[in-house]
C-alpha cells in the first residue's frame, strides 16, 4: 500500500534472476484515524516484479486501491539499474506516477546511483539509492520543482526461511502549497510468515511524516498497519 498521495519506492528486492509476487492488504488506517484519513481506501492490491539480466535489473510495483464501489486509484514505480563494475554499484533511473478516479498523482522522474549487496546465501539483501528527483507540473495549482530522494531497501529471511522481513525507507524533499520545502519520510516494513514456498500471511506498516494529505488538522505523523496475504510466483 504504497501510496495514494504519492510515494516513492520500494520494494522487496529479491536478488534472484526473476521474482514476482501479488499481495492483498486490508488497511486499518481509517479505523485508527477516522477524521484525518476518512477517505483512505481499506483494500490495496499490489503487484511487484524484479528481474535481473546481464546489464543490471528491472523493478516495478503497481498499487491498486479499492473502495466498496470503485477502483479508487492506481500508482506505479518503475526502475531500471545498470551495473557499474562488480562491486555492487549501479546507475538508477525511475519513473513514479499514477491515476485516481478524480485526478492523477504528480509524476516524477529520478536519476542517480545505487549500491546493492547481499549475503552469500542471499538471505540478507540491501540497496541504498541516492537520486535527483524532478516533479512535473500536474495542475494549475501545482508546480514543477527539483528535489532529491534517499532510499534504503532491505530483505531478510530467517527461521529457516519461514519468516521474511523486508521493506524500504524513503527521504525526499516535498513542497508545500506555499512553495516552501519540507522533508518527507516514508517507510513500509513488511513481516511475513511463509506458509509454503508460494503463500505467505503477514503485515505491512506504513509509517510516515509529512506524507499523508491531511486537511482536518495539523497532524503530520501517521502509522497505518495492514493485514495481508502474498502469493509468490
PLM feature spans:
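Transmembrane beta-barrel strands of outer-membrane/channel proteins
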Residues: 24-28, 60-64, 93-95, 128-134, ...
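Short glycine/proline- and aromatic-enriched beta-strand/turn motifs that initiate or cap beta-hairpins
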Residues: 18-67
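Solvent-exposed loop/turn segments connecting transmembrane beta-strands
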Residues: 37-41, 65-73, 99-107, 135-147, ...
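Sec-dependent N-terminal signal peptides
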Residues: 4-15
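Repeated loop/turn-to-beta-strand initiation elements of outer-membrane beta-barrel proteins
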Residues: 55-59, 84-91, 119-126, 156-165, ...
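Outer-membrane beta-barrel transmembrane domain signature
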Residues: 133-200, 206-212, 231-233
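Membrane-embedded beta-strands of outer-membrane beta-barrel proteins
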Residues: 47, 76-78, 111-113, 150-152, ...
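Outer-membrane beta-barrel "beta-signal"
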Residues: 221-233
Amino acid at each position: 500500500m504504497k501510496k495514494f498521495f504519492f510515494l516513492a519506492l520500494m520494494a522487496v528486492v529479491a536478488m534472484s534472476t526473476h521474482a514476482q509476487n501479488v499481495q492483498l492488504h486490508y488497511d486499518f488506517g481509517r479505523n485508527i484515524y477516522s477524521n484525518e484519513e476518512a477517505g483512505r481506501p481499506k483494500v490495496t492490491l499490489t503487484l511487484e516484479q524484479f528481474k535481473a539480466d546481464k546489464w543490471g535489473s528491472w523493478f516495478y510495483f503497481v498499487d491498486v486501491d479499492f473502495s466498496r464501489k470503485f477502483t479508487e486509484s492506481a500508482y506505479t514505480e518503475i526502475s531500471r539499474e545498470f551495473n557499474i563494475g562488480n562491486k555492487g554499484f549501479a546507475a538508477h533511473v525511475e519513473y513514479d506516477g499514477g491515476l485516481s478516479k478524480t485526478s492523477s498523482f504528480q509524476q516524477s522522474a529520478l536519476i542517480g546511483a545505487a549500491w546493492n549487496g547481499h549475503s552469500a546465501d542471499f538471505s540478507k539483501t540491501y540497496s541504498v539509492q541516492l537520486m535527483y528527483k524532478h516533479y512535473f507540473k500536474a495542475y494549475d495549482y501545482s508546480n514543477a520543482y527539483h528535489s532529491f530522494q534517499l532510499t534504503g531497501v532491505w530483505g531478510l529471511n530467517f527461521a529457516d526461511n519461514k519468516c521474511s522481513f523486508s521493506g524500504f525507507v524513503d527521504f525526499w524533499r516535498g513542497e508545500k502549497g506555499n512553495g516552501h520545502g519540507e522533508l518527507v519520510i516514508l517507510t513500509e516494513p513488511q513481516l511475513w510468515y511463509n506458509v509454503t514456498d508460494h503463500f505467505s500471511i503477514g503485515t505491512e506498516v506504513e509509517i510516515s511524516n509529512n506524507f499523508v494529505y491531511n486537511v482536518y488538522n495539523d497532524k503530520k505523523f501517521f502509522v497505518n498497519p495492514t493485514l495481508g496475504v502474498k502469493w509468490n510466483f
